[in-house]
Regions:
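Transmembrane beta-barrel wall of Gram-negative outer-membrane proteins
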Residues: 233, 239-269, 279-319, 344-368
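Gram-negative outer-membrane beta-barrel transporters
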Residues: 512-519, 620-622, 642-739, 831
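Surface-exposed extracellular loop regions of Gram-negative outer-membrane beta-barrel proteins
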Residues: 320-322, 550-595, 618-641, 728-740, ...
Length: 835
């Protein structure tokens, strides 16, 4: 069995799945030898041995039919849905004699590779999304994943108590990056992954292998399609548009020389959504990107690949006015503000990569080697100069009062002036070589070692220019107030230039053994090493995991245990303190993970057996050398010091299946506890009504979201599958936050309100090519299929909070006013596919 994660490789049978099982007599239970097990369409076959066991390698990602025949017995066949490379499918055939009146019985079970959650995108494209980004889907399908405080305006996600910077993202084995200066979800444009180009994805919420890199939380591994024919699609809505084209062409007469192309372009504007915010003004967001993935099969053994992306995000905003009320029945505040000035942000990113893959044709012990090179570049400009004349007042909220809504007392009246001229230029270049070799042992290859290794060199150039300040004037006094000088608040003026080199490598072995009657055992162990020239830190991380699928259990269950050390070396944002000073001696953040879980595949149904999958995992992460941070909307502000330790523990569960035949749905629920403590500092907590604080051992991390629940449910009209309904529900307890500038001793003592949101979509199939014979004059007959959708965002019109705006009175008392996310909006969408 060859367990590969090479993007797009489909040469010979190296990108394979393993089909294995037992052929036996249904009446006696004895094994049947010399039974022919074959796939007719591919001319692949094998025979069962003396113990009735067989093993057959087949191409991944294809629909297959496995057949078995034996002289004197009735033949049997079993359809196989497309599976990912590295999957093992166990199919047992209980055959009957030709003279018997019994029916053949076939049992299937599958062992997924590496403890990763894998999904295809066909059913997920209908999920209502306000961002247009693929990552918005993750909270509905991935374990322990939430959307964070950015809510529906952001595609950032938190995994098991970590922040967004702790997540790895790969597309076709290339690591991808995102802009660093984003402050809010309003500025966020299009992320790298293009849903129109994705073939499948793998996601690990923790305990991942050594080959995946150096982050604390998760891995998202995306593979783009390798086309086999000419296809395309067009999509349009009130929030933007997208289009893609793909194709494959044989070069010359040699069938092994083939060129494939995949090109996609997207445009996004969330002006329609932003106009529902309480901060009124002229929003002009324009986001666009274009990307391509090309491959060329040089011959049987060599393949050349190239990937490219150019992304531009421009956000223009002229604020006009704002009126926000907040508080309780007996104490409510209203903020009224008028604005002058504007904000213009410009983010331009580009990425290009090439790969050369060698897979020699071998009958046994397959091998692959892959050479990769890539470059990423971003130029980010953030400019704003906005003056706000604000008025903060206590208002009457008594029911039935004649003065309801009127001011009772003036709390603050002043001017807030924010200014920024920030520039960040970032360039990352890397070279990488990785490989894999599978050693097969045993008469039926029931024992295998899959060795994988890789080395990588990375160069980073960073230029940062910050000119950022705020002036707060309350009752004609500039705060902070002095008798002689006008002192600005939060002044940052720095010039930082960094050049560094990173080197990393890994080695791991995956040992798989199958024994009749015992099941399949897979043990993976590896080490990861890295060095960074800037802080001169070298580390060595061992990681391991065990997957076991018992054969004697009545239930189809796979058990998993994983653990190891996971270090995250700092990138630029972690090193930059709130005052703009960069700490080049900052060491990596460190953690030790333990993850235990199970995957249960089962079927239910009276008339037809419908497959379901239940995944459950518990985990514990010990943290040290942590860099504390505060989250404001989507902006993460680090302290720039290794000054904290902590832990994260929790439970994740996911259930998915066809609750409605032909329409798959997902249900996710997670519980976690994330705590931290600053070294050398005694934290305190002040309970409501208490004047004095009491000592506590630790405090909540900013991502300490106790519970999250999300679901994506699909249904359709009875007897009419052309009209589909999909519901997206997200519920999460509030995340903690603290007072700006005073969030250390009494750290993260407050919480945002709970987040809850319902998005509803209706999709109607208005054309399908199968109708051509009876509708040969249809307006859309040139298309393969066409859908029209109506999406209702925030169906319940809930006011969810993204962040707070803070104001001070002349008495130096701080008041927080919530910044709410979007209200209810209706979106129209049209999608057309060509083939």
């Amino acid at each position: 069995m060859l367990l590969l994660s090479i993007s797009g490789i489909q040469l010979q049978a190296q990108n394979t799945i393993k089909l294995t099982g037992l052929v036996s007599d249904i009446e006696t239970g004895k094994p049947i030898d010399v039974a022919t097990v074959f796939i007719r369409s591919l001319n692949l076959s094998t025979e069962s041995d003396e113990e009735g066991l067989y093993t057959l390698a087949a191409p991944a990602g294809q629909s297959l039919v496995l057949e078995v025949s034996r002289l004197g017995y009735k033949g049997a066949s079993y359809p196989i849905s497309p599976l990912e490379a590295g999957s093992t499918l166990k199919i047992d055939f209980n055959l009957v004699l030709e003279t018997s009146g019994l029916e053949v019985i076939i049992r299937e079970s599958i062992v997924r590779n590496n403890g990763m959650i894998r999904e295809k995108l066909d059913n997920l494209k209908l999920i209502p999304s306000t961002t247009g980004n693929f990552e918005s889907i993750l909270p509905h399908i991935a374990l322990g994943t939430s959307s964070g405080t950015g809510g529906e305006l952001s595609s950032q996600y938190n995994v098991r108590g970590g922040n967004y910077d702790e997540n790895l993202v790969f597309v076709n084995d290339f690591e991808v990056y995102r802009p660093q200066l984003l402050r809010s979800g309003q500025q966020e444009g299009l992320t790298f992954p293009n849903v129109d180009l994705i073939r499948d994805l793998s996601f690990s919420s923790g305990g991942f292998e050594a080959r995946y890199g150096d982050k604390l939380s998760s891995v998202l591994d995306i593979h783009y399609r390798r086309p086999d024919s000419l296809r395309g699609s067009v999509s349009m809505s009130l929030l933007g548009a997208s289009a893609h084209i793909e194709g494959s062409k044989q070069i010359g007469t040699n069938p092994y020389k083939r060129f494939t192309y995949l090109v996609g372009a997207r445009y996004k504007t969330n002006r329609y959504l932003l106009n529902s915010l309480q901060l009124e003004g002229e929003y002009v967001p324009d986001f666009a990107d274009i990307q391509t993935y090309l491959t060329y099969d040089i011959n049987k053994n060599w393949q050349l690949g190239a990937i490219g992306n150019y992304n531009t995000s421009v956000f223009r905003f002229v604020p006009l006015s704002r009126s926000t009320a907040t508080g309780l029945i007996d104490f409510s505040l209203r903020l009224s503000a008028n604005f002058q000035g504007q904000e213009v942000d410009n983010f331009k990113t580009g990425m290009g990569g090439v790969s050369l893959t060698y897979i020699p044709e071998r009958k046994k012990n397959p091998l692959f080697i892959k050479f990769m090179g890539s470059a990423y570049q971003s130029l980010e400009r953030e400019t704003f100069d906005i003056i706000s004349d604000y008025r903060l007042a206590l208002i009457e909220t008594g029911l039935g009062s004649e003065n309801q809504g009127k001011e009772l007392a003036l709390i603050g009246d002043g001017v807030q002036h924010t200014y920024a001229r920030n520039l960040l230029y970032l360039q990352v270049k890397n070279l990488e070589m990785k490989g894999g070799y599978e050693y097969q042992a045993g008469t039926n290859n029931e024992k295998t070692h899959f060795f994988q290794w890789g080395i990588k060199a990375q160069l980073e150039d960073i230029l940062d220019r910050i000119n950022d300040w705020e002036r707060l004037d309350s009752a004609l006094y500039s705060l902070p107030h002095t008798e002689k000088d006008i002192v600005l608040k939060n002044v940052i003026k720095t010039r930082n230039d960094l050049n560094s080199q990173r080197f990393s490598g890994y080695f791991q072995d995956e040992y798989t053994v199958q024994k009749p009657g015992l099941g399949e055992l897979r043990i993976s162990g590896g080490v990861r090493m890295a060095y960074w020239s800037l802080n001169r830190e070298f580390y060595f991380n061992p990681r391991a995991q065990v997957l076991y699928k018992p054969a004697k259990w009545d239930k189809d269950i796979t058990l998993r245990l994983a653990g190891g050390l996971y270090y995250q070396p700092p990138f630029y944002r972690e090193m930059r303190a709130p005052d703009g000073i960069v700490n080049t001696d900052l060491q990596s953040q460190k953690s030790a993970h333990v993850v235990a879980g199970m995957t249960w595949d089962f079927t239910r149904g009276k008339k037809q057996q419908v497959p379901y999958r239940l995944i459950s995992e518990v985990y514990y992460k010990k943290l040290w050398d942590q860099v504390i941070y505060d989250i404001d909307n989507v902006r993460i502000r680090y302290s720039g010091k290794n000054e904290a330790s902590g832990y994260i523990t929790g439970l994740d569960m996911r259930l998915n299946g066809e609750f409605v035949p032909g329409a798959e749905s997902w249900f996710n629920i997670s519980f976690l506890r994330a705590r931290e403590a600053i070294t050398g500092l005694q934290h305190q907590r002040r309970d409501k009504g208490q004047a004095e604080g009491m000592d506590v051992k630790d405090v909540p991390r900013p991502t300490n979201q106790f519970m999250t629940f999300s679901t994506f449910f699909q249904d359709y009209l009875p007897n009419n599958e052309n009209l589909k309904v999909n519901l997206s529900l997200t519920v999460g307890t509030g995340q903690p936050f603290g007072i700006p500038g005073n969030n250390r001793v009494f750290r993260n003592t407050y919480r945002y309100p709970a987040y809850h949101r319902v998005d509803l979509g209706f999709s109607y199939l208005i054309w399908d090519r199968s109708w051509a014979s009876r509708r040969n004059r249809h307006l859309l007959r040139f298309a393969e299929n066409s859908w029209i959708s109506v999406e209702i965002f925030n169906l319940m019109k809930v006011q969810n909070v993204a962040s707070n705006t803070w104001f001070k009175s002349i008495y130096n008392v701080q008041y927080s006013i919530p910044n709410y996310l979007t209200s209810r909006r209706i979106n129209l969408k049209f999608r057309m596919s060509f083939h």
